[in-house]
From Swiss-Prot:
Coiled coil: none annotated. Pfam families: MscL (PF01741). InterPro entries: Mechanosensitive_channel_CS, MS_channel, MSC/AndL, MscL_channel. This is Large-conductance mechanosensitive channel. It comes from Bacillus velezensis (strain DSM 23117 / BGSC 10A6 / LMG 26770 / FZB42). Belongs to the MscL family. Homopentamer. The gene is mscL. It comes from the Bacteria.
Length: 131
């Protein structure tokens, strides 16, 4: 049973997922700090010193912190946009690399075609003509 678990846990997909979760958590903390420590204070300044995190309304015993909710929405949009930019950049780099590889393959094919044409022409010159 231990060996089955070990082989399951060490499969490539599981390890990739674990690494992704750890990196995602760290990235989330960076973006949260960016939003809470830099962007939201600037937005508050633009809106006359308003601090979203402190916005709340109370109904009896219920304390509704809608400012925290607004901040969470801003976090979501910034994280989503950041991920979009990263994925778009990776896609562009991948397409550029593929285009370079295709151009290289086409060049190799052209060289091969040229060599084969030369070989054919040389063989024609050496072969007796059957006219």
């Amino acid at each position: 049973m231990w060996s089955e678990f070990k082989s399951f846990a060490m499969r490539g997909n599981i390890m990739d997922l674990a690494i992704g979760v750890v990196i995602g958590g760290a990235f989330g903390k960076i973006v949260t700090s960016l939003v809470e420590d830099i962007i939201m204070p600037l937005v508050g300044l633009l809106l006359g010193g308003l601090d979203f995190s402190g916005l709340a309304v109370t109904f009896g015993d219920a304390h509704i912190k809608y400012g925290s909710f607004i901040q969470t929405i801003v976090n979501f949009f910034i994280i989503s946009f950041s991920i979009f930019i990263v994925i778009r950049t990776i896609g562009k780099l991948r397409r550029k690399k593929e285009a370079e590889e295709e151009a290289e393959e086409a060049e190799e094919t052209d060289q091969q075609t040229e060599l084969l044409t030369e070989i054919r022409d040389l063989l024609k010159q050496r072969a007796p003509h059957n006219d």
